Amino acid sequence: MTKQATNAVLKKGQRFPLTIKRLGINGEGVGYFKRHVVFVPGALPGEEVVVEVTDVKPRFAEASIRKIRKSSPDRISPPCPVYDQCGGCQLQHLSYEATLKEKREIVKQAFERHTTLRADTLTILPTIGMEDPWAYRNKSQLQLKTEKGQVKAGLYVMNTHKLVDLSSCLVQHDATNEASEVVKQIVQDLQIPTYNERKRTGILRSVVSRVGFETGELQVILVTTKKDFPKKDLLVEEIKSRLPHVKSLQQNINPKKTSLIMGDETISLFGEETIEETLGDISFSLSARAFFQLNPKQTVKLYNEVKRAAALTGKEKVIDAYCGVGTIGLWLADQAREVRGMDVIAEAIEDAKENAKRQGITNVQYEVGKAEKIIPSWVRSSWIPDVIVVDPPRTGCDDQLLKTIKQTKPKRIVYVSCNPSTLAKDVEQLQRSGYKVKNIQPVDMFPWTAQVESCTLLVYEGK
């Protein structure tokens, strides 16, 4: 439908009743007005609402709730005082039990929309949730901003320059909440300039804190625009004094005009360069920029699903693509003949090697680089993988990697996904090359958000 036709039907400011049919991939309610898709943040399936159009796009419209005529029985009051402003969570107004069902439904809808597979023929298992879905995040990344002389540390409202000050967050571990609040107060006391995005002035951009759930070790990273600045030594001393349990204090320098949190250079200000975390029987060393799953308790459940899907017997050669600090590969190593992994972040690979060494795991090998370049070189040297595990970013697998996988033809692919849409699109390509989806296991890694993690098993059956 053309944009002109859409504008002829829907206008900004227009109000009308709407029945919500389902949840969208971003957690918004989805309804249809004269065959036009309308996204309504905060609305739930089955609800009858009166909405006001806030924006009209070529293929859909966005609207806000003006009145709820018929409320969902699954609607609850959000416990977070800044839930409507922050945007970090999208589903605190939906009961947790219902959230788990909806996340499975989001996966199903993604396959209906992006594949030729019939969703009713797929084995999509019930979502694995948490017993206590609060205080689960081990890492906090808050932007710093000074307004009317007051230093704020928080998150930006989506698509705006408004920063919501977060003195505490219900989904963050208490240690990260404390660290962020203490650093914010020190910056206020010392009057250190925070970064001004518009003027590109100031020093401190962000405070990042990470805690080991099992070890209790705390890491604080100060993201700055330059390496040296006034009162830097005093800032370090104050953090050491007010956060005496901090094990690792790092500085990351990011001088660029970018939405990315961290830059390329990290230096140690105090203590160790890494902190330790334990998953199951395996301990991991985490540097400032290293990726590590944000919910350790659910990570163990997810990785056990990966191990179950891989179905290793001790004879298989396994590739851990997008390996990060080696978490998945090391989890599988005791049941594999050999595990090889790669990642584009050099520090992550160094951590992966160190993690393997510390565990005494000798049947693993890690390289810096892109999977789509490294895997063919292994194949050329007659090292053919039996199982490939992929855990890509939200954008999904690189097209060249998918091409490489299809050429390599491993017996099994275990696809760990954080985005049902890109998962479905990638699966569509793989199933055309002879792979069959055996099952999809959603895992709720981020309670109260719209994000859905999943573990999908694909088996090569030939064309």
Curated annotation (Swiss-Prot):
GO terms for molecular function: 4 iron, 4 sulfur cluster binding; metal ion binding; rRNA (uridine-C5-)-methyltransferase activity. One of its GO terms (biological process) is rRNA base methylation. Its EC number is 2.1.1.-. S-adenosyl-L-methionine binds at residues 293, 322, 343, 391. The active site is at residue 418. The keyword S-adenosyl-L-methionine applies. The keyword Iron applies. [4Fe-4S] cluster binds at residues 80, 86, 89, 169. It holds the Pfam family TRAM. Belongs to the class I-like SAM-binding methyltransferase superfamily. RNA M5U methyltransferase family. This is Uncharacterized RNA methyltransferase BH0897. It comes from Halalkalibacterium halodurans (strain ATCC BAA-125 / DSM 18197 / FERM 7344 / JCM 9153 / C-125) (Bacillus halodurans).
